[in-house]
């Protein structure tokens, strides 16, 4: 059982640095300049400052603009906004100007003061779309994080991608491996223990209630959900031997996909029609990534790089994985590849880079970076060739999903 858990659990330290974002730019592309103007008249100075900083960071992370403080307004974009607060309700008006004329205007209302980061993210996402620039539809999506709270106890929290907003959703006992259950992010799956037996639950965020899906001896973890949310890939070990299973939520039918005497875990759908699955296996004597058709039990090796590839995430025909570097002690880097090509792209350069997860549009990858005694949540903008880091102040991370 210890060997099974070891391939899943990686515990990270906490970062206490003060920088809200570190921008690593690997491209010399000249971007249009944009000026941020805050016309708000808020008495809450902390909210005013934090909201402004999030807007600026969002515009940077979008990789569509160069944010400048002092420039000629007539020759650059202007992001002009007014934020108002009335009790627990926020209202926001945003105008995008260029060349002295309005290019777009949006008005938003939010009930729930603590969720103000999502209001900022939504406004930047909509403004980018209105200008016809490279979309950032993932920006207001939520991240699920399982973190240790005390000995043999862990919480599942929901956060925005900057980690400014954090809310505990599931608490009490050992709660592990959260996985979003639909693209609307209204439900997720997670593993907990029911009378010492690993059990998979579904949590409905609309009702704030959890319901039991299935249980198994050894372990049970939901690692992926298909496009329409009707099927799960589940790692189960009813006889202390982990394999990948397909679970149909409509028919309640459970199908074993792998049957290997070693370890097969972390199944992910891949391909435009979800007809294949990639997973991590030790059938070569070390963790590596394999693929097989859903209607076949014949697996083929996918990754021929590295000798410890123990984490994978997929988007259509692409996959990202974390790989231990052979000649660099403790260094794990993230790589991107397609199942239709031999080309592999290295996305990180140093430290321990773990838990890669694709955004909903495949254009960004979130991961956890551990370097020395510090850790951060990283966002890779793949096409822009940029990486942004946000300090982790959430405790020891067990797993994440985006």
UniProtKB/Swiss-Prot annotation:
InterPro entries documented for this protein: 6-blade_b-propeller_TolB-like, Tol-Pal_TolB
GO annotation, biological process: cell division; protein import
Xref: Gene3D superfamilies: TolB, C-terminal domain
GO CC term, one of those recorded: periplasmic space
Cleavable signal peptide: 1-17
UniProt keyword list: Cell cycle, Cell division, Periplasm, Signal
Protein location: Periplasm
Domain of life, per lineage: Bacteria
PANTHER family: PROTEIN TOLB, PROTEIN TOLB HOMOLOG
Subunit structure: The Tol-Pal system is composed of five core proteins: the inner membrane proteins TolA, TolQ and TolR, the periplasmic protein TolB and the outer membrane protein Pal. They form a network linking the inner and outer membranes and the peptidoglycan layer.
Entry's family note: Belongs to the TolB family.
Reported function: Part of the Tol-Pal system, which plays a role in outer membrane invagination during cell division and is important for maintaining outer membrane integrity.
Protein name from the UniProt record: Tol-Pal system protein TolB
Lineage: Bacteria, Pseudomonadati, Campylobacterota, Epsilonproteobacteria, Campylobacterales
């Amino acid at each position: 059982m210890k060997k099974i858990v070891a391939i899943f659990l990686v515990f990270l330290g906490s970062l206490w640095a003060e920088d809200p974002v570190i921008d690593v730019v690997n491209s010399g592309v000249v971007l249009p300049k944009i000026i941020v103007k805050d016309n708000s008249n808020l008495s809450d100075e902390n909210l005013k400052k934090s909201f402004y900083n999030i807007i600026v960071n969002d515009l940077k992370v979008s990789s569509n603009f160069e944010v400048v403080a002092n420039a000629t307004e007539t020759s650059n974009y202007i992001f002009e906004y007014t934020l108002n607060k009335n009790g627990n309700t926020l209202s926001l008006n945003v105008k995008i100007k260029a060349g002295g004329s309005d290019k777009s205007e949006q008005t938003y209302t939010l009930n729930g003061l603590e969720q103000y980061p999502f209001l900022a993210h939504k406004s930047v996402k909509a403004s980018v779309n209105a200008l016809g620039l490279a979309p950032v539809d993932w920006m207001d999506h939520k991240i699920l994080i399982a973190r240790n709270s005390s000995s043999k106890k862990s919480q599942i929290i929901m956060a925005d991608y900057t980690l400014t907003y954090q809310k505990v959703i599931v608490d009490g006992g050992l709660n592990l491996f959260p996985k979003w259950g639909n693209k609307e992010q209204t439900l997720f799956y997670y593993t907990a223990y029911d009378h010492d037996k690993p059990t998979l639950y579904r949590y409905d965020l609309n009702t704030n209630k959890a319901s039991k899906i299935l249980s198994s001896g050894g372990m049970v973890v939901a690692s992926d959900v298909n496009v329409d949310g009707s099927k799960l890939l589940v790692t189960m070990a009813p006889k202390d031997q982990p394999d990948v299973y397909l679970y149909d939520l409509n028919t309640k039918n459970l199908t074993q996909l792998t049957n290997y005497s070693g370890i097969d875990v972390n199944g992910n759908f891949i391909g435009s029609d979800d007809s294949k699955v990639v997973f991590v296996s030790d059938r070569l004597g070390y963790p590596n990534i394999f693929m097989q058709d859903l209607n076949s039990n014949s697996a083929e090796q996918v990754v021929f790089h590295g000798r410890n590839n123990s984490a994978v995430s997929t988007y259509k025909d692409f996959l990202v994985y974390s790989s231990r570097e052979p000649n660099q002690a403790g260094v794990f880097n993230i790589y991107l590849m397609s199942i239709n090509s031999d080309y592999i792209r290295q996305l990180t350069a140093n430290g321990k880079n773990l838990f890669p997860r694709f955004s909903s549009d495949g254009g960004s990858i979130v991961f956890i970076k551990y370097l020395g005694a510090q850790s951060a949540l990283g966002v890779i903008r793949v096409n822009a060739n940029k990486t942004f880091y946000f300090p982790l102040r959430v405790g020891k991370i067990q797993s994440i999903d985006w």
